[in-house]
């Protein structure tokens, strides 16, 4: 009986996602829309202009940016579209 209970506990721990994971978009501006599962608790969207036009980068976390780059960070699934 104890073995069965221990087995059920182990299976439950392995099968459950014990830490919350976040889903963020992670494509560059000219790429097809893709998502990734992140360990971080936020998503970001960076926007800037260069000789190619407006560039948009998306991903997990909330990185620091250089002057002239706009950054938006958010904390819900797929919020960085």
Swiss-Prot record:
Keywords associated with the record: Acetylcholine receptor inhibiting toxin, Disulfide bond, Ion channel impairing toxin, Neurotoxin, Postsynaptic neurotoxin, Secreted, Signal, Toxin
Annotated Pfam families: Toxin_cobra-type (PF21947)
Subcellular locations according to the entry: Secreted
Annotated S-S bridges: 24-43, 38-60, 62-73, 74-79
Signal sequence bounds: 1-21
SUPFAM superfamilies from the UniProt entry: Snake toxin-like (SSF57302)
Domain of life: Eukaryota
Function according to Swiss-Prot or TrEMBL: Binds to muscle nicotinic acetylcholine receptor (nAChR) and inhibit acetylcholine from binding to the receptor, thereby impairing neuromuscular transmission.
Protein name: Short neurotoxin 2
Organism in which the protein naturally occurs: Drysdalia coronoides (White-lipped snake)
Lineage of producing organism: Eukaryota, Metazoa, Chordata, Craniata, Vertebrata
């Amino acid at each position: 009986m104890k073995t069965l209970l221990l087995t059920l506990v182990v299976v439950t721990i392995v099968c459950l996602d014990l830490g919350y994971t976040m889903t963020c978009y992670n494509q560059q501006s000219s790429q097809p829309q893709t998502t990734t599962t992140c360990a971080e608790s936020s998503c970001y969207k960076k926007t800037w202009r260069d000789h190619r036009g407006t560039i948009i980068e998306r991903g997990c976390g909330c990185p620091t940016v250089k002057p002239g780059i706009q950054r938006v960070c958010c904390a819900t699934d797929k919020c960085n579209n």
